[in-house]
Amino acid sequence: MWKNIGRYPVHNRMLCAAFGVCMLLLYGFHLARFRLGGVLLDEVGDLATILALLGQFSPHQLWVHIGVTVGLDLLFPLAYATLFGGLIARGFGAYSPALLVPLAVLVGFDLFENLSQLALLLLTLLQAAPATIEIIAAFKALVTPIKFSMLFLTSAISVMAVMSLGIQQSLRLWDFGRARKLQKRH
């Protein structure tokens, strides 16, 4: 299956829909950041900062954060995986399976981070033992930098895929123009 992934057609509609969903989810994150006072726990990878933020959140902010994590943050990996995966498969064709590995790692670590974040928020809301919260926060602090590293790598691969698509389209247009000139001569 993996060796044939580059052969699956990636339609413009699907890519446009995935892009639109990503933009809507990013706007939702922006609104949530505003309601939470400027910082989302999803963006923090330092243990001390995570614990400090959890201590500063009011119960209302914890509930808003739980809603963001369950609603937006669980859908976002699916949306960007569709967008990035489609661009990579379309831009690199037969080479795409190897180039999709960072995306798969990214989605896995993002989902691990979301689950640990949800556990942190719920345990903080329930006023669980600080040692329990600290253990889960330490796990999140390990996972978040890996997630962002894979996000940067996957984004770079996606940009190269878009550049590849642009070059392919330019070559097709150049060949078409050349063929028309040859046709006029004969």
Language-model regions, residue ranges each:
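Short, highly charged, low-complexity non-transmembrane loops/tails of multi-pass membrane proteins
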Residues: 169-186
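Alpha-helical transmembrane segments of integral membrane proteins
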Residues: 10-17, 64-74, 97-108, 138, ...
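Hydrophobic alpha-helical transmembrane segments of integral membrane proteins
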Residues: 92-127, 184-186
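Interfacial loop at the N-terminal end of multi-pass membrane proteins
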Residues: 2-67
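Alpha-helical transmembrane segments of multi-pass integral membrane proteins
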Residues: 109-173
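Membrane-interface helix-boundary motifs at transmembrane edges
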Residues: 5-8, 89-97
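Transmembrane alpha-helix/helix-exit interface in multi-pass inner-membrane proteins
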Residues: 27-44, 74-77, 107, 111-119
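Hydrophobic alpha-helical transmembrane segments
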Residues: 67-88
